[in-house]
Amino acid sequence: MVDNCRPWLHKRVADGNYLGFLIETAGDDPLVVAGGGLLLLDWPPTHLDPQTTRGYILNVYVEPAHRQRGLARRVTEACLEACRARGIRVATLHSADAARGIYEKLGFAATNEMRLNL
């Protein structure tokens, strides 16, 4: 983890605004082989959606030796279930091209988001 990220992450975990999900191997000496996070974002309500929290899924990663086993999907499903349990109706993420199919199978669709780096 990047050192300057630690204080940011610790604050959000303590506030309950960041949830982490990990998958470990079985056995006496388990290893974390996959994980991801859910950032709960304060969001302005609109006439289309009065909900004031959105979920942003980030840092989904699977160790190379454990890929192609559905672990990224399981991590993402855990994030989505956490959203549902909190009544959150919108979840977003940014996907690597290689992972796009995983998210599309879960119902994610491309949007019209644009970005400008300042």
What does each model-identified segment do?
Residues 48-64, 115-116:
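Conserved acetyl-CoA binding element of GNAT-fold acetyltransferases
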Residues 76, 83-95:
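Conserved GNAT acetyl-CoA-binding A-motif
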Residues 22, 30-40, 56, 61:
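Conserved beta-strand in the GNAT
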Residues 36-46, 50:
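A conserved beta-strand-loop-helix scaffold within acyl/acetyltransferase catalytic domains
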Residues 1-25:
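Active-site rim helix/loop that mediates acceptor-substrate recognition in acyltransferases
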Residues 88, 104-114:
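Conserved acetyl-CoA-binding loop of GNAT-fold acetyltransferases
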Residues 66, 70-78:
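Conserved acetyl-CoA pyrophosphate-binding loop and the N-cap/start of the following alpha-helix
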Residues 91-102, 117-118:
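Conserved beta-strand-loop-alpha-helix junction that forms the acyl-donor binding cleft
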